[in-house]
Regions:
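Extracytoplasmic beta-strand/coil segments of soluble accessory domains associated
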Residues: 2-44, 62, 72-92
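Surface-exposed loop/interface segments of Gram-negative outer-membrane beta-barrel transport/assembly proteins
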Residues: 93-197, 207, 237-242, 248, ...
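Transmembrane beta-barrel domains of outer membrane proteins
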Residues: 66, 87-89, 216-220, 229, ...
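Residues that define the transmembrane beta-barrel architecture of outer-membrane proteins
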Residues: 80, 209-213, 243-247
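Periplasmic plug
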Residues: 22-69, 101, 188, 192, ...
Length: 318
């Protein structure tokens, strides 16, 4: 995203959000609905078709953008969507120079969670909804209260079908004042399992550590110019089981063998391991696989864990 805001008209979007995911770059807008609108990347004079996140930013000396006729004149049709020229580092001083840098940081969700109703308010709101549905159709208050009492936990008839409160025998969960019974205790056991709601937001999102290390050596003489580097990145995401690890290496050597002969090599290696939960199931963004969707829409009465009758989290032996 370094080029965003530095070149007029360039757009960069990272719609995925997963650690290590490459951004979508548009230099000349959208010119086709069926063909690719991605620019051509050229690294040290060679067209590059790989993932941009595979290039260690610490190895980049400069980045420039061609977006006008110059792109077409040099690269033809391949430059129709613009060209991004990347030049990697080389030696600047004659003496051998070793550079090491380490970076530490933290990844956190900066957008606060919505202010949502709690467990008690959710039951109260559902009860009031059932009551009003009968009043709206002409039923008496007594009939409406009776309907709400019977239907609140009846999933087949529009109720919640789920109880996470222990209510004394003979008493109702919600009174005729539409408030939770003060004698109701959060947490319910049927003898086999214990039911209590969890904070899905706190369970799904967390602040995690990010660390990056890079070391390079470079130098030059009248005939030799060399640059070599290795890098390691461990970037943990803000949701559980999301992370990106990258190992990079680069060796760039130029040698003036004769006045008329110059030989060189530029080799790069990248190994990356990316982990991220599914953000959609098929074509449905509102699926249970989308943790962002679920954590923001699930009712505050449902648990995240299966618990034993004593309240401890059940562990699957398999």
């Amino acid at each position: 995203r370094d080029s965003s805001g530095q070149v007029a008209g360039i757009q960069t979007v990272n719609a995925n959000g997963a650690p290590g995911a490459s951004a979508t770059v548009r230099i000349r807008g959208i010119g086709s609905m069926s063909s690719s609108n991605a620019p051509l990347y050229v690294v040290d004079g060679v067209p590059y078709d790989g993932d941009m996140s595979s290039i260690n930013p610490q190895d980049i000396e400069s980045l420039s953008v061609l977006k006008d006729a110059a792109a077409n004149s040099i690269y033809g049709a391949r430059g129709a969507n613009g060209v991004i020229l990347i030049t990697t580092k080389s030696a600047k001083t004659e003496k051998a120079k070793v550079t090491f840098d380490a970076k530490w940081g933290s990844n956190s969700r900066m957008v606060p969670q919505y202010d949502v109703i709690g467990t008690a308010e959710y039951y109260e709101t559902q009860y009031k909804t059932l009551y009003n549905s009968k009043i709206y159709t002409g039923s008496s208050k007594a009939e409406a209260y009776n309907y709400a009492d019977k239907t609140l936990l009846d999933a087949k008839n529009g109720g919640l079908g789920y109880l996470v409160y222990t209510v004394p025998d003979g008493e109702k969960l919600i009174g005729n004042n539409f408030k939770l019974n003060p004698n109701a205790k959060l947490g319910y056991s049927d003898g086999k399992y214990y039911y209590t709601p969890d904070d899905w937001y706190d369970e799904v999102f967390s602040s995690n550590f990010r660390q990056e290390y890079n070391v390079n050596i470079s130098g030059r003489s009248d005939k030799l110019n060399y640059y070599a580097s290795v890098g390691y990145l461990n970037d943990s995401g803000i949701i559980q089981n999301s992370a990106y690890k990258r190992y990079t290496g680069r060796a760039k050597v130029d040698y003036q063998a004769k006045e008329w002969l110059k030989v060189g090599t530029n080799i790069a290696y990248t190994y990356s391991d990316s982990q991220a939960p599914d953000y959609q199931d098929g074509d449905s963004w509102g699926s249970s696989a989308n943790l962002f969707y679920v954590s923001n829409t699930i009712a505050p009465i449902y648990p995240l864990y299966v618990r034993n009758a004593d309240g401890s989290i059940a562990i699957n032996p398999n």
